[in-house]
């Protein structure tokens, strides 16, 4: 990616820290054929992770009334981390599956690598994360989820649904829920080998970090739990 942000984990997979370097990589080389030849699950998970940048960045920005120019620019272009992926995601996966890179795959790759990197560098640490990644970090303490090897972006895709429910973005939730089903992303706890009984530990971990320190309102454990329960009902 084009970002200067690094994520460091403990050996057991739980989050250790965020690390911002002085500058990102000087050169980024993208070969769409190489990506098309790679296992599609990595592109698939990358789409889920990238989409969170838009929802987290724009929601976090509502919690800061004094955004500077570069941060405001990052917020404005963050839609490029989600809109093209929703438009081209299913087709891009098919191109990857068939090892035939085309426009859809190229647009998605640019969203994952370039758009997200630019936004990340512009907005700084406080707007680089949010509730979806807070919940992802929460699920790192769920042993069953970890044991089944679910990918980072796969879990983040589910956590976007939590964010949208907590933030009462109902129309956007409906759209992304349908997109998630079409993409094969998780839409219920069982899809990531978790249960409602795991949520106390997950939520405690989720709210213990810095991910929602710049948010337009206080996120409470009940907000997250209620959101998960609502999503479970939709999935029935």
Would you name each region that the model predicts?
Residues 169-236:
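C-terminal charged capping/lid subdomain of soluble metabolic enzymes
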Residues 21-22, 122-124, 211:
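Short hydrophobic "helix-edge" motifs at membrane interfaces and signal-peptide entry regions
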Residues 54, 58-62, 92, 115, ...:
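A short secondary-structure junction motif
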Residues 67-179:
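Active-site segments that bind and position negatively charged phosphate/pyrophosphate groups
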Residues 1-77:
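A glycine/threonine-rich phosphate-anchoring loop and its flanking beta-alpha core
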Residues 54, 58, 112, 142, ...:
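Generic structural signal for hydrophobic core residues of well-folded globular domains
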